[in-house]
Amino acid sequence: MSLSSGACGGKGVDANPVETYDSGDEWDIGVGNLIIDLDADLEKDQQKLEMSGSKEVGIPAPNAVATLPDNIKFVTPVPGPQGKEGKSKSKRSKSGKDASKPTPGTSLFSPSEGAASKKEVQGRAGDGASAGGLVAAVAPKGSEKAAKASRSVAGSKKEKENSSSKGKKERSEGVGTCSEKDPGVLQPVPLGGRGSQYDGSAGMDTGTVEPLGSIAIEPGAALNPLGTKPEPEEGENECRPLKKVKSEKMESPVSTPAVLPLHLLVPVVNNDISSPCEQIMVRTRSVGVNTCDVALATEPECLGPCEPGTSVNLEGIVWQETEDGMLVVNVTWRNKTYVGTLLDCTRHDWAPPRFCDSPTSDLEMRNGRGRGKRMRPSSNTPVSEAAAASDSKGTSSSSKTRAGANSKGRRGSQNSSEHRPPASSTSEDVKASPSSANKRKSKPLSDMELNSSSEDSKGSKRVRTNSMGSATGPLPGTKVEPTLVDRNCPSPVLIDCPHPNCNKKYKHINGLKYHQAHAHTDDDSKPEADGDSEYGEEPALHADLSCNGAPVPQKGSLSPARSATPKVRLVEPHSPSPSSKFSTKGLCKKKLSGEGDTDPGALSNDGSDDGPSVMDETSNDAFDSLERKCMEKEKCKKPSSLKSEKIPSKSLKSARPIAPAIPPQQIYTFQTATFTAASPGSSSGLTTTVVQAMPNSPQLKPIQPKPTVMGEPFTVNPALTPAKDKKKKDKKKKDSSKELESPLTPGKVCRAEEGKSPFRDAAGDGIKVESLLNGSSESHQSRLASIKAEADKIYSFTDNAPSPSIGGSSRLDSTTPTQPLTPLHVVTQNGAEASSVKTNSPAYSDISDAGEDGEGKVDSAKSKDPEQLVKEGAKKTLFPPQPQSKDSPYYQGFESYYSPGYAQSSPGTLTSSSQAGMEGQPLKTKKDEEPESVEGKVKNDVCEEKKPELSNSSQQPSVIQQRPNMYMQSLYYNQYAYVPPYGYSDQSYHSHLLSTNTAYRQQYEEQQKRQSLEQQQQQQRGLDKKTEMGLKEREASLKEEWKQKPSIPPTLTKAPSLTDLVKSGPGKAKEPGTDPAKSVIIPKLDDSSKLPSQPPEGLKGKLGEASHLGKEASEAKTGTECGRQAEVDPILWYRQETESRMWTYVYPAKYSDIKSEDDRWKEERDRKLKEDRSRSKDSVPKEDGKESTSSDCKLPPSEESRLGSKEPRPSVHVPVSSPLTQHQSYIPYMHGYSYSQSYDPNHPSYRGMPAVMMQNYPGSYLPSSYSFSPYGSKVSGGEDADKARASPSVSCKASSESKALDILQQHASHYKSKSPTISDKNSQERDRGGCGVVGGGGSCGSVAGAGGTDRSADRPRTSPSQRLMSTHHHHHHLGYSLLPAQYNLPYAAGLSSTAIVASQQGSTPSLYPPPRR
């Protein structure tokens, strides 16, 4: 090339420029953008060059120009590669050409070296063309090259390689030139470097440079001292262009863009513009050839973006899912890894479908089979290329990026390619040839678009391309992702979208979550649903398949995946061992459970966090697969249990990306850290507690522990370890009756018996999941409950990021004593509610009871009570369970209520027991909804009896959990925010049940009587126990205060007197005026209180006038604590009375059950209110504060206020705002949950709620948030409840958000008054059963503190969460006050009803009454 000689003189430049220029035509054809931008200059240059080709050659500038043309040349082709890897490649080719010609490639790379500047300076004469061009700046070529260098960071390798065609040509020509040009600087290094660049860089380019876009240039620069020998380069380059051409699949498309900038730079940097332009033209021509090469390269493998309908298999790691359903994935496509690619989860099969437990396992599976799978799934070149390029670059760079975060995602996605194609389409192709293909088609659109757009900036994404390459490396960085993957992997069971019209099934709760959040109405995820449904049809098989990436192959791969797991987990090969065990013995889930679980579980448990994590992941992965397989194979107890576990696994899996916005727990970064620290710490690093938790979880919580553990692992591998350990242990327990297992054994028995039928149904009803989601199938409900509970737990964990141990450890480990409880609940949730109870008996009898109770098993009276609470809660959450499945990612609303609420209500123990209980509740709800509907009342009674026990047991854990709850409160709040919907729902149910169910009505009337007593007591408590009038006055003033504080209507003060309440009711109505939803809610609460069966109560008499408002007022009064709840609840009830009735019709059994439970818990609440009043007497001076304090919401004033929990809970409508504001990301979950539970556009509660909003926030997120706040406050406030009650003002003022705290507390008190929080005994029972463990946890917990120091001591600890959760489950489930909160939602919109309410209610105290439902 003359260009090179240009350094010496430019004679060569003239000649070669002409040559290059000759290529100019081609170049024109090849590169349109460059031509467009450079056209004028190039034409000028062309004319100049043609007119005086060697005229300027003598000038050093012409050399630079010539070099610049070279640059332009590569730049021209480069445009394709530049933006993207393809561009980079294209560019590289051109760069190489350039380098070889004038050695501009050298300068291009040189700049990276630093030699570029020298060369540039020198090269101004000749080398500058190449060196200067790269350096950027000095000469047009310099700047062009600099631009190119920057662009070519990834493109440089392409320049190098692609330069082979033209570059080689030019290099061969310019070898001498290059040498001439860069004799001192460029040539010596460049020659050797270039040889290296093209030789070593050839491999490096593909493997290293491509994956590492920026590094590519540097290696290029280093190698590209390029002076290297253009000739060797040429030889190499010629070969390389072919190779590189392939590599540069998308060079052409990107080529144009890259060219433009370079071309622009060229004109800008044209020191020797006249010459440079000419030479640029010349060079451009040569580049034209390269462009042709690039085009060829692009055409075969690297064609432009795929057509819209094209089904593309992408291998990628899902880093997180955004709340709007976008998956942030590192995808490898066409041998290029795009790091920030966004995929629409609803339109593509995405990571959640990747059920591989461990990202590592996914990676490894992808490695051994994953890569093959990748190739297999993508029968098209992209797969092969991905396999090849992914392997090569995965090896070099994948281990870097992927090691950090992709290990899990990409391989995992491939591993669970069946279900995870969205993230890793390629892998999914195998699984979803039909559905995956469909999804792929959708995904390719988005993915391709993303890739097209991302490829420019995502050259480095390739790093993640090789999920296998990074199998080992990615593990660390992937730890978070692994959690995600693990979470995703563990949930092979498809989760059906609870949405009535939605048939979508999500392998991942993430998918469901995102789907619910934004795809509720669209079936974009349908492909995934198809895959899922495929999976759902064959839950076990597909679960195994999904979980392990391939049915049997995945099992076989599972071992690799497991192998990857060990990498990720850092666990001993044991992980792989379980992996192979699970893989090999996946079919023998039982046996595997015994072996793998024991081995992995014990190993994991006994091992370190990492060990357990590995084991968990392995266990989870294997267990998921095995569970699913076993479930499929053995749809017996064990299969049922496994199924349950599986479902939780799935939930976890789904939840894992839960972080999506905050991807499953993993996505929750803080959760990852928290769970890693807190979970492991809380859980004794999850190892110690996990071991216990695992035993516990195996007892009854394989699912719960799994979710818990999974939740933690979800957040952190350690957390995952508990989940897996739990799962393993669970399986262990199932397989072997060990001490830990003994609970599980009973759980297993129960599970086998009850869980078996529901979970077997779930297993058998993989499809039933849909029904379950719809609440149609009890078995599905159980399953969904398990999944939701798990996901919820996971989500709770996520929400509980502050105290991962609460979410995972606390549920699992935090409450070691209650851990069995948690496991029990998990088991309960697993569908072995009764068995769960049995399982629970060992360490967590109470919560265990909850699970059992749902099953109607009295095996554990204590356990049964909690179980019943769980069951009742589940019933209340009957819809929520459905939504849970749907919102599973979002906290599955109610699941959050009860399951997460429990776990989250108590930072440590309560979390385990509460969450376990809550989870059990969902299971119960699902499982027992049908049975429980009938036996709901009886069971409720039993539950009431047992609830005190559970309460006591729960309370202790609650205490443990309360501390963690402080920091977990925000999470808890989010989770607990769901509780209000529960209570509200319960109120809705309540109203319906009151009207439809005589028994329930009686119970409710009793509750209301108690509430009346509570109100009286609260009145007394306000002024004196018997100073009702004084209290009324106080409440009136409080009411006014609250009114002043928009949100705090008389609810708080109202408790004293029905009349006051009636006043309160109107006041509340007015307050609801402030809080649009509030007035509605007030009627609802009123409705709840009043309802047909309410009239008998004295409250009812007054309600006669203000019937709903009056009832609401009376309810509000019924417990200033509970009064707020009751108050809001009655309004909500009123509003939801219609909805409730509708729900009753829709789910009459559930509603009757819930209502009876509601009645029970109301009675309990009355009792509790009495207790609270007595306890509140110390708080009497400050009825508000007292109520707030007694409301548990106040307990963790700072936290609750911080979470706006007080607000959220206090104002069911308004509360939505606060929790939403505080936890907007979670709000969608709660929202969706409530919505899922019972979104009736016709229902008054939903009146103001746009259906779309509801769909977006399936569980009435706002209300959920609101609900959670109380839980959180109650949980953390369990201990603070006493303080708050003793010194309400102190509690309130203790937190900067004392207002919110007050609101929360008032909500809690409201719930107390509404739920049997006040009544110590019944209250506990009812709180557990009726008040809702979550609700009870919040308001009961507060009651325990305010109205029941006893309770605070006993109940508030665990019970607050659980009790509150149950009550709230009932209330929220009935009244869906959350939906009323969604009334606020309309104005609060996506934000937070609570936040809006908070602003409306100016003063938090005011918030209390309205929030109270």
From Swiss-Prot:
<feature type="region of interest" description="Disordered">
    <location>
        <begin position="1273"/>
        <end position="1369"/>
    </location>
</feature>
<feature type="modified residue" description="Phosphothreonine">
    <location>
        <position position="745"/>
    </location>
</feature>
<feature type="modified residue" description="Phosphoserine">
    <location>
        <position position="433"/>
    </location>
</feature>
<feature type="region of interest" description="Disordered">
    <location>
        <begin position="1004"/>
        <end position="1127"/>
    </location>
</feature>
<feature type="cross-link" description="Glycyl lysine isopeptide (Lys-Gly) (interchain with G-Cter in SUMO2)">
    <location>
        <position position="1155"/>
    </location>
</feature>
<feature type="zinc finger region" description="C2H2-type">
    <location>
        <begin position="495"/>
        <end position="520"/>
    </location>
</feature>
<feature type="compositionally biased region" description="Basic and acidic residues">
    <location>
        <begin position="1197"/>
        <end position="1210"/>
    </location>
</feature>
<feature type="modified residue" description="Phosphothreonine">
    <location>
        <position position="381"/>
    </location>
</feature>
<dbReference type="GO" id="GO:2000291">
    <property type="term" value="P:regulation of myoblast proliferation"/>
</dbReference>
<feature type="modified residue" description="Phosphoserine">
    <location>
        <position position="742"/>
    </location>
</feature>
<feature type="modified residue" description="Phosphoserine">
    <location>
        <position position="533"/>
    </location>
</feature>
<feature type="compositionally biased region" description="Polar residues">
    <location>
        <begin position="1288"/>
        <end position="1298"/>
    </location>
</feature>
<feature type="region of interest" description="Disordered">
    <location>
        <begin position="354"/>
        <end position="484"/>
    </location>
</feature>
<keyword id="KW-0805">Transcription regulation</keyword>
<keyword id="KW-0517">Myogenesis</keyword>
<dbReference type="GO" id="GO:1990841">
    <property type="term" value="F:promoter-specific chromatin binding"/>
</dbReference>
<feature type="compositionally biased region" description="Basic and acidic residues">
    <location>
        <begin position="519"/>
        <end position="529"/>
    </location>
</feature>
<dbReference type="GO" id="GO:0005634">
    <property type="term" value="C:nucleus"/>
</dbReference>
<feature type="modified residue" description="Phosphoserine">
    <location>
        <position position="577"/>
    </location>
</feature>
<feature type="modified residue" description="Phosphoserine">
    <location>
        <position position="575"/>
    </location>
</feature>
<feature type="modified residue" description="Phosphoserine">
    <location>
        <position position="379"/>
    </location>
</feature>
<feature type="modified residue" description="Phosphoserine">
    <location>
        <position position="757"/>
    </location>
</feature>
<feature type="compositionally biased region" description="Basic and acidic residues">
    <location>
        <begin position="1099"/>
        <end position="1115"/>
    </location>
</feature>
<feature type="modified residue" description="Phosphoserine">
    <location>
        <position position="803"/>
    </location>
</feature>
<feature type="compositionally biased region" description="Basic and acidic residues">
    <location>
        <begin position="925"/>
        <end position="949"/>
    </location>
</feature>
<feature type="cross-link" description="Glycyl lysine isopeptide (Lys-Gly) (interchain with G-Cter in SUMO2)">
    <location>
        <position position="1063"/>
    </location>
</feature>
<feature type="region of interest" description="Disordered">
    <location>
        <begin position="1"/>
        <end position="26"/>
    </location>
</feature>
<feature type="compositionally biased region" description="Basic and acidic residues">
    <location>
        <begin position="1154"/>
        <end position="1189"/>
    </location>
</feature>
<feature type="compositionally biased region" description="Polar residues">
    <location>
        <begin position="797"/>
        <end position="843"/>
    </location>
</feature>
<keyword id="KW-0862">Zinc</keyword>
<feature type="modified residue" description="Phosphoserine">
    <location>
        <position position="848"/>
    </location>
</feature>
<keyword id="KW-0539">Nucleus</keyword>
<dbReference type="InterPro" id="IPR013087">
    <property type="entry name" value="Znf_C2H2_type"/>
</dbReference>
<dbReference type="GO" id="GO:0005654">
    <property type="term" value="C:nucleoplasm"/>
</dbReference>
<dbReference type="GO" id="GO:0008270">
    <property type="term" value="F:zinc ion binding"/>
</dbReference>
<feature type="compositionally biased region" description="Basic and acidic residues">
    <location>
        <begin position="750"/>
        <end position="763"/>
    </location>
</feature>
<feature type="compositionally biased region" description="Polar residues">
    <location>
        <begin position="950"/>
        <end position="962"/>
    </location>
</feature>
<feature type="compositionally biased region" description="Low complexity">
    <location>
        <begin position="386"/>
        <end position="405"/>
    </location>
</feature>
<keyword id="KW-0863">Zinc-finger</keyword>
<feature type="compositionally biased region" description="Polar residues">
    <location>
        <begin position="902"/>
        <end position="916"/>
    </location>
</feature>
<feature type="modified residue" description="Phosphoserine">
    <location>
        <position position="845"/>
    </location>
</feature>
<protein>
    <recommendedName>
        <fullName>Zinc finger protein 609</fullName>
    </recommendedName>
</protein>
